[in-house]
Amino acid sequence: MEFYESAYFIVLIPSIVITVIFLFFWLFMKETLYDEVLAKQKREQKLIPTKTDKKKAEKKKNKKKEIQNGNLHESDSESVPRDFKLSDALAVEDDQVAPVPLNVVETSSSVRERKKKEKKQKPVLEEQVIKESDASKIPGKKVEPVPVTKQPTPPSEAAASKKKPGQKKSKNGSDDQDKKVETLMVPSKRQEALPLHQETKQESGSGKKKASSKKQKTENVFVDEPLIHATTYIPLMDNADSSPVVDKREVIDLLKPDQVEGIQKSGTKKLKTETDKENAEVKFKDFLLSLKTMMFSEDEALCVVDLLKEKSGVIQDALKKSSKGELTTLIHQLQEKDKLLAAVKEDAAATKDRCKQLTQEMMTEKERSNVVITRMKDRIGTLEKEHNVFQNKIHVSYQETQQMQMKFQQVREQMEAEIAHLKQENGILRDAVSNTTNQLESKQSAELNKLRQDYARLVNELTEKTGKLQQEEVQKKNAEQAATQLKVQLQEAERRWEEVQSYIRKRTAEHEAAQQDLQSKFVAKENEVQSLHSKLTDTLVSKQQLEQRLMQLMESEQKRVNKEESLQMQVQDILEQNEALKAQIQQFHSQIAAQTSASVLAEELHKVIAEKDKQIKQTEDSLASERDRLTSKEEELKDIQNMNFLLKAEVQKLQALANEQAAAAHELEKMQQSVYVKDDKIRLLEEQLQHEISNKMEEFKILNDQNKALKSEVQKLQTLVSEQPNKDVVEQMEKCIQEKDEKLKTVEELLETGLIQVATKEEELNAIRTENSSLTKEVQDLKAKQNDQVSFASLVEELKKVIHEKDGKIKSVEELLEAELLKVANKEKTVQDLKQEIKALKEEIGNVQLEKAQQLSITSKVQELQNLLKGKEEQMNTMKAVLEEKEKDLANTGKWLQDLQEENESLKAHVQEVAQHNLKEASSASQFEELEIVLKEKENELKRLEAMLKERESDLSSKTQLLQDVQDENKLFKSQIEQLKQQNYQQASSFPPHEELLKVISEREKEISGLWNELDSLKDAVEHQRKKNNDLREKNWEAMEALASTEKMLQDKVNKTSKERQQQVEAVELEAKEVLKKLFPKVSVPSNLSYGEWLHGFEKKAKECMAGTSGSEEVKVLEHKLKEADEMHTLLQLECEKYKSVLAETEGILQKLQRSVEQEENKWKVKVDESHKTIKQMQSSFTSSEQELERLRSENKDIENLRREREHLEMELEKAEMERSTYVTEVRELKDLLTELQKKLDDSYSEAVRQNEELNLLKAQLNETLTKLRTEQNERQKVAGDLHKAQQSLELIQSKIVKAAGDTTVIENSDVSPETESSEKETMSVSLNQTVTQLQQLLQAVNQQLTKEKEHYQVLE
């Protein structure tokens, strides 16, 4: 934690602020005490009573009067603050407050601020003091002026004691003392400084001089003591409020007469008192300085205050008297002090707020620091976890290194064991060499000739063998270079294949996305099949082209298969030849085993044959590697064939999709048929409704006819009633009928308003209303006819029956309407259910297709990944085989060096054995020649095999060309696939995207992008490993070159040693010839012969010479010769010893060579160990790369499955395109029909909704009419009850009419009643005509709608 974050800092800031405020107030209270004490002392020292002359006083008064008009306010305003300061000082002295140490001083900035505040406050106080002075409470304020000479300082400063009590200045030069004292005062009291000084300037009569003197004084204050800043103080003591005013007034009253007297006497005593004043000023200055520098305790300060009180006792009495008049000023001062306190409190509150803000900022910073700490802790935790993980990895790697070290130790132990075994063999060989040297010493003379011949022969053989070996090495290098070139070509082919695969994968991903879009959109929107059809025709052409190219590929593949079969036959022939050679070699082995005499040679030949076998095995391994490569190429071709087959399968799947689309079209046709059936049903319903409407119209016509008949009958009845006499009864009946008619009119008006809203069923209601009105009228008429008609009751009953029938008809119509509404609702429900079922079926179809596609993609991905795994495993096996071959080559080089050493040793042994077996040379030489012939035959076979290898390389190049052709064809296929994809994308763009499928596609795309990123990273890793492998290969090549250089060095050394030996043997032979010539000078043998032949001839001739010599001479000669022979023998022994030493030297040289070879072998073994280590590291890296490859394979399975799905979909698309070409026109027509049907269905659906709404309205209206009809039935029942009464009244009327048949009044009344009835009938006819016209209009509208719908359906048909 930092300092600002601690709780100590939070507590410390407010405590500091509080202490500063407390010190501020305390210093403010105690500031001016010490200054006031000094001022009092100075004033007491300088208060000298002076007497003023009357003339001077009068002049002073006159000048005072002159100046009062302009400068009164200035003098008074300056005197009031001085009085205030005196009162303050006296009040503090009375209360005996302890002085404050003078070392506490405020800064200049706080002093300036206080100056500004006090300058604002003091003008108000000055005005109040001026008003009080004008009231003439204190008569001694006005002092007569004294003439003053022009000096830079005023002559008298006695009035300055109001500001600083006790300070009084003389006329000459008391300004300096006054200035020094004023520096201790607050800078805000500049305006109050020295009012008496201003009065003296007023006496001189120049306002400008007064202003200049003020300026000089203020300047002197700031110049003399700029370092002392006195703090202002406003006393807050309540007890000290009354006494300061009184003391101030008394001091002013006492000072002014003294001042006048001093001014009057100053002129006469100026010269005498100058020295005294100067001495007093110096003493006072020293006193002030000592006071400034001193520190007072509380007791000392109290003593100083008591002394000042004693000296200012008289002044206090005068001030107490004048304290009453200055209460108002003190109140104002208190108010100002309260204001200052409030300002200070506000400052304190502001500081507190600032402290709070600082604490809040501290809290926020703490929170931030806590957040940072938590983040750092989390980071530390993650780093610790990573550290633990790294430690675990390091531990694992350390364990692995320990295991590797253990393995290396085991290998070293094995190598040391092998080295020990080799040393033992070398010791055995050395023993054998020593034995052979002993044998050579006994048989030198016999073996020298044979050694020469054999040596020359062996040298020739060595040269031939070395030449052959060099040729073989050159061939090996060429083969290795060819193999590297083939590897580079294979790597390039692999890269191209990977690029092709990546391109195919991308295209498969795109095609899968497009296919998914097609599936979803084909299911969702079948309206755009027309555009697809137009594009399918183009794709059919491309599909035909693809099929043609596939046929070409199949033909090329058949040719390639034939070539491969021929190559396999050749390989089989070569294998058979190798087996035959092996059989021959076995026979030779058996022959060699049978020959005991030439066992050593046979062993050597076995070694040579073993070497040749190794070379053959190496060639066979190279052939096997080439076979593996051919198999890999064949697998690649098989993969291409599989790709082609997959394309075909996809075409078949596309055809299946087309079949599914055809099935979907068939389902659409079924749906259309169902729609047609529903349309027929709707038509039937409409026809039924029309039929019903026509029936209702016929019934309406019949009712109109009945109305007409009833009207005629009513007229007849009216004529009959007109003949009857009873007027009153008729009038009552008419009134009842009118009331009923009015009621019926109201009901009819309500019904008319309802009938206006009803569409098709208003006709029946209007007919019923007309029937009701007619029946009521008939009832009214029949009441009049009861006298003449007996069967009126039966008519009424028939009418009731008719009414009941009409009611039943109305109910039946309502039931029919409800049934029709139910049917319509059921149909709508069925339509909606069918739509939902269609949607569900489409979704199920889409899900099934997606599941099938996923399953197919998964299977295809699994197969492709398996193929990739196989290919990669084969590649790894080939790499391992190459590494093993290189290791074998290194081992073979080491063995070859050992074999060369063994051959050298075996040649030595052979030379010794040839000397022993001179007799058996003929047979062994023949066998040797035969073996050489066999070796030559094998070398010829090797050459044949090399030729076969070259042919295989040419075949491989041709196959690579075929692969390139196939790749070009694949590129063409890909371009066609891209075209198809573009077409599919165009088709897909016409379909609206489905949200769910888009989400799935986006997720799959993300997964594919992630897989591609992983593939790229793994490819980078594989390339890195390849680079490492190439580096290792280069190192191996360098090692091989170093081995070859060492071999050449060794061969050169061997050749040099062999040449030296030949030279030594020739020298020995020459020396032997010279010795023999010296022994037998007579014998002469040609020198052209070989050494053995020359010795044989020389022996023969020497024997002949020896035989021709005589006895004694011969004996002497023989003795002489024996002596010479002994000498020669000694010489020969010496020479033999020399030769032995030479042989020993040669053996030492050979041993050195062996040691150097062994050292080099050890070095090479170390290098081999290092190479083994690197190989193991590479194997470990290969294992890691294999693991990564396995991961890649597991991840690439999905991609390959997607590719297969794409191919499958392409096949299906091609099939679909083939089949869609036939259905283009039909689909277009179906689309048009579907669009029209959809429009019609939408219109019919909207019309059905409208009809439902109208039916609902009709139901409501019917309910209203039913209620009205029920009320009417109740009224009819009442009317039926009234009919009986009417019948009785009619019988009475008839009886009365019979009595009064001759009255004329009845005729008049009868003339009036038909008129009323005719008016009523006219109104009824008008209303009926209106209803009829409305119904006709509605019928016309309905007919128009029906005609429109019929035309619409005809158009649809």
Swiss-Prot record:
Keyword Kinase: no
Alphabetized InterPro entries for the sequence: Kinectin, Rib_rcpt_KP
Region (Disordered): 48-81, 103-218
Regions crossing the membrane: 7-29
Highest taxon in the source lineage: Eukaryota
Basic and acidic residues composition-biased segments: 121-135, 172-182
Expression across tissues: High levels in peripheral blood lymphocytes, testis and ovary, lower levels in spleen, thymus, prostate, small intestine and colon.
Outcome after substituting residue 226 to R: In a breast cancer sample; somatic mutation
Biased composition (Basic residues): 161-171
GO BP field: microtubule-based movement; protein transport
Segments forming a coiled coil: 330-1356
Topology of this chain in the membrane: Single-pass type II membrane protein
Pfam families assigned to the protein according to its UniProt record, in alphabetical order: Rib_recp_KP_reg
Keyword Ribosomal protein: no
Keywords: Coiled coil, Endoplasmic reticulum, Glycoprotein, Membrane, Phosphoprotein, Signal-anchor, Transmembrane, Transmembrane helix
GO molecular function: cadherin binding; kinesin binding; RNA binding
Residues the record lists as Phosphothreonine modifications: 153
One GO location term (cellular component): endoplasmic reticulum membrane
Cytoplasmic compartment residues: 1-6
Glycan-linked positions: 172, 435, 772, 904, 1055, 1088, 1263, 1329
Similarity remark: Belongs to the kinectin family.
Function: Receptor for kinesin thus involved in kinesin-driven vesicle motility. Accumulates in integrin-based adhesion complexes (IAC) upon integrin aggregation by fibronectin.
Quaternary state and interactors: Parallel homodimers formed between the membrane-bound and the cytosolic form, and also between 2 cytosolic forms.
Protein name: Kinectin
Organism: Homo sapiens
